[in-house]
Amino acid sequence: SQISYSQMIPSFQGVYDKKSSSDGSTYVLDFDNDDTCTSNCTNSFYGEIGWNTNMSSYTVSIWVKSGSSNPGTWRGFFNCYSSSSDGFQLDSDGSGRYRFLANVGNAKFGNNSITTTWNHLAVTADGSQTKLYYNGNLVSTDSWVENTWNQIEIGRNRNTDRPGDYFIDEVRVWNTDLTQSQIQAWMHKTLDTSHDNYSNSTSDNLKVYFQMSSSSISGTTLSDQSANGNNASLYNVGEVELVSSYVPISDLNSSYETNVEAIWSASTTSSSDASNGLTMTVSSTLSEENFAVFGNNNTSNTSTSDLPNGTAIRSARIWQVDKSGTVSASIIIDISDATGNSPTVGAATNYKLLHRIGTSGNFTSVATGGSVSGDNITFSGVTVHKGFYVIAATDSSNL
């Protein structure tokens, strides 16, 4: 259903309706700044927190989408210091790459890393090394750390010039270096207290969390959703326009948040990462509004419950899928990864992909296996629906 923007959105520039994959409405900040301004850009839209704690161990993660395919050099969207003499910023290097630019050094997030679709960036520092991650993949390791902080700003660089034209969401600042597995595990879901470093206490490692939800934006204040109250003041606000924007994040049922992965526009036609045996691929790059997020119930072995006629056994592992828009994908399930078993693999047609809408009730068959490679079964051309999936077999020896 449509929502009234005047009823739902506070009246300042840059708050955009972001349809979440669960059909709720959250928001994303659009720093739609003038990409031609190179000096005296003090009228640009930005958010700021006063900060007085230097950190040599930290993690900064952020979902970002560029408003242009090749922003000019120094067009920034995050920084931690009030001049270029110290601290660092996340910006464009002017050659199509997101960059970590610091007083002690700089590093890139990979060639062609700037796109006009959503990408996840993360920076970690452990006191001696700085690492960069792009969509969960380690892309840079350097033997230096920038440890000087006197502010946290979003929407511009340290010099307050060359503001950026970027959408940003899910900004998280920690005073510890998270592992790659932690970054990957949480990039497609909002934070909750099941995170090892977060219990909603001021003693937690999480120091700033800008979720961009309806409850976190009010007037010219962007509220910190950590326990610390590090709210950002928003400056140079203007008129609001209604534009939809989509970040591949979902709130899956808590019992199905093991190994949460996604397939979205930045995945192009590459396989998604595997959620304990299940991967997805698409034949053509998804548009921004179309994506799927999926996790599983962390259960191995097999089951004979809730089966439709014509099947004898299914995986006890159940994958929950949440999706936005329309996604048609090949779903590939690795039997040994899914069940922990090493069965006699049958013909592709012996396998069925089952689906149900809720957490209980009988499954229905939605696809028959199209090919087998080792113990990987491919179900091709699946119209992905929200709900719960398992792999089943017509012969109990095949799982």
Q: Where in the sequence are the language-model features?
A:
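Short hydrophobic/aromatic patches on beta-strands that form ligand-binding or substrate-lining surfaces
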Residues: 58-68, 121-123, 154, 168-174, ...
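Short, solvent-exposed beta-strand-to-loop segments that form ligand-recognition rims
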Residues: 134-152, 197
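Short, aromatic/His-centered strand-loop micro-motif at the edge of beta-sheets
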Residues: 98-120
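Extracytoplasmic low-complexity segments
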Residues: 1-43, 187-320, 327-343, 347-350, ...
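Localized edge beta-strand/strand-to-loop motifs within extracellular or lumenal beta-rich domains
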Residues: 117-131, 175
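Extracellular/lumenal carbohydrate-interaction signature centered on repeated Trp-anchored short motifs
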Residues: 49-60, 111-119, 146-148, 160-167, ...
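Extracellular glycan-interaction patches encoded by glycine-rich segments
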Residues: 36, 103-109, 148-169, 173, ...
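Extracellular glycan-recognition modules
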Residues: 37, 41-99, 129-130, 162, ...
